[in-house]
């Protein structure tokens, strides 16, 4: 696994891969070799996928990293990927909402995301669709967008930066490590969120 992320044994903490918008084979040919080399089996406890994996072979690849996958349906996904638009789960001391980007409009509107967060009554809201990774706190909630793992193009950005998030959850503290791939090398930024008790 890429350096800079602490791993620990369950149930003290969990390492969650947040990934989405691969768009393979429609908008991208594959996940980069560098990302594949760093996403090794046995390190990650769970995967949250924001959709647009597109085909079964890519979902099968994600299962080689971790068999515990929760995914929502993206608008380009084959029927076998998921038929769920949103779901809520508990990770550590957090209620986490995972939502399809096409159920949110506009997808970068913080007030629209906050409405969805309140509707689901979650501490962390995970969404995709922007193809730009972000992790920020807004109105007492942690919002995570893993961006596009392949850097798949959009109508507004022909060259997004490939990215994903590793979320380290320890009780009521979550640290999001945002991995981006630029010019053949990985950089990591982090954002921390603690739930008020």
Stretch-by-stretch model annotation:
Residues 70, 107-173:
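Conserved beta-sheet core of the metallophosphoesterase superfamily
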Residues 68-122:
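Helix-adjacent hinge/juxtasegments
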Residues 170-197:
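Charged phosphate-binding loop/patch that engages nucleotide di/tri-phosphates or the phosphate backbone
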Residues 1-12:
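Single conserved hydrophobic/aromatic residue that forms the stacking wall/gate
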Residues 24-27, 53-58, 76-82, 104-108, ...:
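Active-site environment of divalent metal-dependent phosphoester hydrolases
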Residues 13-17, 88-97, 138-143, 169-175:
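Beta-strand-turn-beta hairpins that frame and shape the catalytic cleft
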Residues 11-68, 77-85, 93, 163, ...:
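N-terminal active-site segment of His-dependent metallophosphoesterases
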Residues 18-20, 46-52, 70-74, 98-100, ...:
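Active-site neighborhood of phospho(di)ester-bond hydrolases with catalytic His/Asp-centered motifs
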């Amino acid at each position: 696994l890429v350096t800079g992320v602490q791993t620990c044994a369950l149930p003290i903490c969990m390492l969650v891969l947040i990934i989405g918008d691969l768009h393979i084979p429609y908008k991208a040919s594959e996940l980069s070799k560098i990302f594949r080399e760093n996403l090794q089996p046995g390190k990650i406890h769970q995967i949250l996928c924001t959709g647009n994996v597109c085909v079964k072979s890519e979902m099968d690849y994600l299962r080689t990293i971790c068999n515990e996958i929760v995914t929502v349906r993206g608008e380009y996904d084959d029927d076998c990927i998921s038929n769920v638009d949103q779901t809520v789960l508990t990770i550590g001391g957090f209620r986490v909402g995972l939502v399809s980007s096409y159920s949110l409009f506009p997808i970068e509107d913080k007030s629209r995301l906050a409405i969805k967060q309140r509707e689901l009554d979650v501490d962390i809201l995970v969404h995709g669709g922007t193809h730009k990774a972000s992790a920020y706190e807004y109105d007492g909630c942690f919002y995570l967008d893993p961006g596009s793992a392949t850097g798949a193009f959009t109508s507004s950005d022909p060259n997004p930066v490939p990215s994903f998030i590793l979320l380290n959850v320890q009780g009521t503290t979550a640290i999001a490590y945002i991995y981006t791939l630029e010019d053949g090398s990985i950089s990591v930024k982090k954002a921390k969120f603690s739930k008020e008790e």
